Amino acid sequence: QTLFESGDEIHFIISDVKVTFMQFPYKLKSANHIHGLSMSSLLSLAAMKAYALVGRAKWKDYVDLYFIMKDHYSIKEIIKKADELFGSSFNGRFFRQQLSYFDDINYTEKVEYVGEDVQDHIITEFLTEISYSPF
């Protein structure tokens, strides 16, 4: 089932899983190949979320970054990877600021949690703390 399509993205639901295919202006190496599909590593996906967050504030990206930083990678690792992938097009300082700025968030895409829901204030408090933590 196709959910929606824009100029550079198309969103599907395949076997109850939301899948997005996008055209991306940067060349990224695929770390994983699953059933013939190339996928970036989790760290590269986190870096792409960091890059996107500076230009668009979608709640789903904050939620994804919350889980990635809570369970997998530090903000330092994500910023380092984003610098490698995007060079001067990425600004780590702006990313850190955006992690603690919640006034213009777009909530149009509902977040569906696997397992227990996490309350919004838990996510915002965690990300704010991370954004102010020393490198």
Describe these PLM feature segments.
Residues Q1-F135:
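Compositionally biased terminal segments of proteins
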